[in-house]
């Protein structure tokens, strides 16, 4: 219940900020926002991946989103690590036996997150 309320509060903050946000990575208190339309991820695998609107939280509270390879349209899971603008990848990605996709995996700090339009809001 506390987790739900904190995410709801974070969403309320994002809603209030949406009209005034002009630049990515603006920080308000302990929440930070990121303009997803401008974000790209440079991995150590096959080049640059563009994020799509597929966001989830792991059971541990880790935050990740799915990125798509522009060339072969493979989906990759990218975690938000450390500071919200830092992304980490695994040296040896594993393959999802059900979908056949390779997923990037690593340990990350815990963040709560919410999506508002094209903005990702992360709250510690």
UniProtKB/Swiss-Prot annotation:
Keywords carried by this UniProt record: Cleavage on pair of basic residues, Disulfide bond, Neurotoxin, Secreted, Signal, Toxin
Domain remark from Swiss-Prot or TrEMBL: The cysteine framework is XIV (C-C-C-C).
Endoplasmic reticulum found in the keyword field: no
Tissue spec: Expressed by the venom duct.
GO molecular function: toxin activity
Post-translational modification comment from the UniProt entry: Contain 2 disulfide bonds.
Functional description taken from the UniProt entry: Probable neurotoxin.
Name of the molecule in the record: Conotoxin Im14.2
Source species of the chain: Conus imperialis
One Gene Ontology cellular component annotation held by this UniProt entry: extracellular region
Cleaved propeptide residues: 21-99
Signal peptide (residue range): 1-20
Subcellular location: Secreted
């Amino acid at each position: 219940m506390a987790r739900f309320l904190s995410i709801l509060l974070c969403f309320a903050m994002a809603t209030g900020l949406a009209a005034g946000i002009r630049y990515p990575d603006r920080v308000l208190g302990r929440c930070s926002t990121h303009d997803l339309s401008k974000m790209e991820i440079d991995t150590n695998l096959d080049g640059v991946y563009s994020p799509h609107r597929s966001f989830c939280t792991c059971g541990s509270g880790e935050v990740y989103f799915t990125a798509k390879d522009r060339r072969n349209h493979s989906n990759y899971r990218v975690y938000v690590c450390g500071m919200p603008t830092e992304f980490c990848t695994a040296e040896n990605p594993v393959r999802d036996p059900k979908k056949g996709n390779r997923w990037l995996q690593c340990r990350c700090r815990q963040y709560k997150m919410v999506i508002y339009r094209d903005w990702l809001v992360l709250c510690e």
